């Protein structure tokens, strides 16, 4: 009958959202012979032209999902964000004093506060839009449908197909839904409930201004070494981070400023901004920082930084519906790892969907039960780590914005944060994804065994 899941049929999954995590997941599921349909609400793929960086670990996860993803990343102009020099090919994260002038005779001089070795190609940076453009080419065009804003999901029973209704009135039937629709996720609102504070993001009281700057201009502003390597300039109530992108032809620069006020509209996270406001926030900072600020456009967007920390999602799954990436655990960007954690999600889900296919094709368990067990497994494996990131990203921004940076008598106190920052960074960089895969397979297998036992006992009773 129409709408009923037939045993042995290939699993059909709808991915809601065409951001980086949604597209990476689509590539991974296609590789595992899962029938995928990807629905994006905008007319095209929505990433802006700002920079993004991936850890070496996240890139290895991409390789596990499908090597074509790494090929797309490299073809989009990704470069190591922070190699020191020819003698030392490793990447480093650097925190420098962005506020105080330490040498009157050399305005370019800034005191190095801390440096962490991220290893060879520890971070690779690129433009978001260029990576996504290269990534989309990996997916068959018939998989993607744009201008599809999700309105509702109708659940009619575990062994019945889900009915997706879009704002344009069209409907689609699928076996499962994975919401990768970002921080303002409609899928999250559906499974957690309208009006539930956990369904919506909340303001972190930080705003961001970002731009791309030609490398030659960046060198004039910062000096060659700082321009060609990642640096994070910290100071009271603000910080500025930059790193090279586009084959080192540009730098991606983002300024974050603390804001004690409430954001006026939590449905609209972007507002018109101006360089004059940035200049006020960074008045009195080091000449290098002010030089970079002067290279931002006079008129530009001001991005409110929202996240899901105040009211974390209590679960990522409901039946045959699941959340991944920012839809599940949108964090502030201060670890630079939100997308990396989303890539880990995609690897976990691709692993699970492969097992679901095996279970269904072998007729061990029904498709509905297999999918539900898979999403329960995903929730168990991924929620704790991903929620930790949301918390930790808030924590490290507090380090960067300490008022103590402005008081020389309290510099030693302020600098005690860096050992903790190193530990937090290592937790992200040195994640054992092989162990995650093993735990995922074991957890799913245990759930499947419990379902088989339950089915066997039910047959005996009959």
Curated annotation (Swiss-Prot):
Chief subcellular location: membrane
TM regions (residue ranges): 10-30
GO biological process: pigment biosynthetic process; secondary metabolite biosynthetic process; sexual sporulation resulting in formation of a cellular spore
Cofactor(s) required for function per UniProt: FAD
GO CC field: membrane
Localization per Swiss-Prot or TrEMBL: Membrane
Pfam family, one: FAD_binding_3
Superkingdom, taxonomy of origin: Eukaryota
Entry membrane topology: Single-pass membrane protein
Enzyme class at the top of the EC tree: oxidoreductase
Family per record: Belongs to the paxM FAD-dependent monooxygenase family.
Protein name as catalogued: FAD-dependent monooxygenase dbaH
Organism: Emericella nidulans (strain FGSC A4 / ATCC 38163 / CBS 112.46 / NRRL 194 / M139)
Taxonomic lineage of the native organism: Eukaryota, Fungi, Dikarya, Ascomycota, Pezizomycotina
Gene: dbaH
């Amino acid at each position: 009958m129409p709408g009923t899941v037939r045993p042995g049929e290939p699993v059909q999954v709808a991915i809601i959202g065409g951001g980086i995590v949604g597209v990476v997941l689509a590539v991974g599921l296609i590789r595992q012979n899962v029938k995928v349909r990807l629905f994006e609400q905008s007319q095209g793929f929505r990433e802006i032209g700002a920079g993004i960086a991936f850890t070496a670990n996240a890139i290895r996860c991409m390789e596990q999902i499908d090597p074509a993803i790494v090929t797309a990343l490299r073809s989009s102009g990704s470069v190591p964000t922070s190699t020191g020099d020819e003698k030392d090919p490793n990447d480093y994260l650097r925190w420098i004093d962005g506020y105080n002038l330490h040498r009157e005779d050399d305005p370019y001089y800034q005191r190095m506060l801390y440096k962490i070795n991220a290893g060879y190609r520890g971070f690779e940076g690129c433009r978001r839009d260029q990576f996504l453009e290269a990534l989309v080419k990996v997916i068959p065009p018939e998989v993607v449908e744009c201008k599809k804003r999700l309105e509702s999901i109708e659940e009619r029973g575990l062994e019945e197909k889900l009915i997706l209704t879009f704002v344009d009135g069209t409907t689609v039937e699928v076996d499962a839904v994975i919401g990768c629709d970002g921080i303002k996720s409609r899928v999250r609102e559906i499974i957690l409930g309208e009006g539930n504070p956990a369904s919506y993001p909340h303001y972190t009281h930080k705003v961001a201004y970002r731009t791309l700057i030609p490398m030659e201009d960046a060198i004039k502003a910062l000096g060659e070494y700082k321009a060609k390597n990642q640096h994070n300039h910290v100071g009271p109530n603000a910080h500025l981070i930059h790193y090279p992108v586009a084959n080192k032809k540009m730098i991606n620069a983002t300024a974050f400023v603390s804001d004690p006020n409430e954001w006026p509209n939590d449905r609209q996270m972007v507002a018109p901004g101006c360089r004059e406001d940035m200049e006020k926030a960074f008045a009195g900072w080091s000449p290098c920082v002010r030089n970079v600020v002067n290279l931002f456009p006079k008129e530009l967007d001001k991005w409110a930084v929202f996240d899901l920390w105040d009211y974390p999602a209590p679960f990522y799954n409901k039946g045959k519906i699941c959340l991944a990436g920012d839809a599940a655990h949108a964090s502030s960007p201060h670890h630079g790892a939100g997308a990396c954690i989303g890539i880990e999600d995609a690897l976990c889900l691709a692993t699970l969907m492969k097992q679901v296919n095996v279970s269904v094709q072998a007729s061990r368990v029904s498709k509905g039960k297999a999918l539900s067990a898979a999403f329960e497994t995903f929730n168990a494996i991924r929620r704790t780590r991903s929620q930790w990131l949301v918390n930790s990203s808030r924590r490290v921004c507090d380090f960067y914005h300490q008022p103590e940076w402005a008081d020389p008598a309290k510099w030693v106190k302020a600098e005690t944060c860096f050992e903790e920052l190193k530990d937090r960074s290592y937790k992200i960089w040195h994640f054992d994804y092989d162990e995650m895969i093993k735990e995922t397979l074991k957890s799913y297998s245990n759930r499947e065994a419990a379902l088989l036992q339950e089915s066997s006992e039910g047959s005996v009773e009959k």
